[in-house]
Regions:
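Alpha-helical transmembrane segments and their helix-membrane boundary motifs
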Residues: 61-78
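Core of compact, soluble alpha-helical bundle domains
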Residues: 1-59, 85-110
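GGDEF/GGEEF active-site signature
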Residues: 172-234
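Catalytic-core segments of nucleotide cyclases and related cyclic-nucleotide turnover enzymes
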Residues: 209-213, 232-259
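Active-site-flanking beta-strand signature of metal-NTP-handling nucleotidyl enzymes
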Residues: 146-151, 188
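Heptad-repeat coiled-coil signal-transmission/dimerization helices
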Residues: 127, 131-132, 148, 171, ...
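Short regulatory alpha-helical coupling segments
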Residues: 124-143, 158, 175-183
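Conserved nucleotide-binding and Mg2+-coordinating catalytic segments in signaling enzymes
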Residues: 111-129, 150-163, 172
Length: 259
């Protein structure tokens, strides 16, 4: 590259601003506009793996509030500038970096869509979808599968008395305890307001008892729960039947605690 990485970065930013695709750039000073673009362009010039530099620049832009479409547009502007300078090989590298960035953003969006935003565990839809798949898998391979549902005792009263902020703290704490208790092969999710569930692959009654014991050591003081478990083959052949039986046993446990 005949021009310096710095000069090419300036030209790329101007290109993005002219195209109106890099709208957020207009809010930054000149140094802020460039960010780590010079490092990215220098990596292209040296035939280094430019993707890590592109991702570092993208993370920097994301921290400043840039939308993914603005970041991709800025990287594409770099490609157009290089193309005009006859740097076809570098342009191809830029295009590949944009593809990888879009793939990363798409994967992150897909994963975020599966997560409960408050607690970070699987949301209701994702957990039920996974349960259906695991039931089908367990039936095909004739393996064991257990579903355990949990309900935080007296959560509504605590929420009303101490406020939603305290209620949210309890939900996050219990979700963290569930994640800390589950094995890598297990799955945990939030399936209602204060209801959670765990799916134990190859789980039987002994595994469930051990899981609940470990969970109790992880749960913060002052948090108590009711639980109900159901097992594939325990009169259950579908995920709907598993949830129905686990719910009945959950409320049986809750009633016994209240008696």
């Amino acid at each position: 590259m005949e021009a310096s990485a710095w000069d090419l970065a300036v030209e790329s930013v101007e290109e993005a601003l002219r195209s109106r695709a890099g709208g957020s750039l207009a809010r930054l000073g000149r140094l802020g506009q460039l960010g780590s673009l010079p490092s990215f362009i220098a990596a292209l010039a040296d035939d280094d793996d430019a993707a890590p530099h592109a991702f570092a620049h993208a993370r920097e832009r994301e921290s400043l509030g840039f939308a993914p479409c603005e970041i991709a547009a800025e990287l594409l502007a770099v490609g157009r500038v290089l193309d005009r300078g006859g740097e076809r090989h570098a342009r191809a590298s830029v295009d590949r970096c944009v593809e990888l960035y879009v793939e990363r953003v798409t994967d992150e969006l897909a994963e975020n869509a599966r997560r409960d935003p408050l607690t970070g565990v699987l949301n209701q839809l994702a957990f039920h979808t996974l349960a259906e798949k695991e039931v089908a898998r367990a039936r095909r391979y004739r393996s064991q599968l257990a579903l355990v549902v949990f309900d935080l005792d007296n959560f509504k009263q605590t929420n009303d008395r101490n406020g939603h902020q305290e209620g949210d703290r309890l939900l996050r704490a219990f979700a963290a305890a569930l994640r800390g208790t589950a094995r890598e092969s297990d799955a945990v999710g939030r399936i209602g307001g204060d209801e959670f569930a765990a799916l134990l692959v190859q789980g039987d009654e002994r595994a469930v008892r051990a899981f609940v014991r470990r969970l109790h050591t992880e749960v913060p003081d002052g948090v108590s729960t009711s639980a109900g478990a159901a097992y594939l083959g325990d009169g259950c052949a579908t995920s709907e039947q598993l949830f129905a039986l686990a719910d009945r046993r959950l409320y049986g446990d809750k009633s016994a605690r209240a008696a």
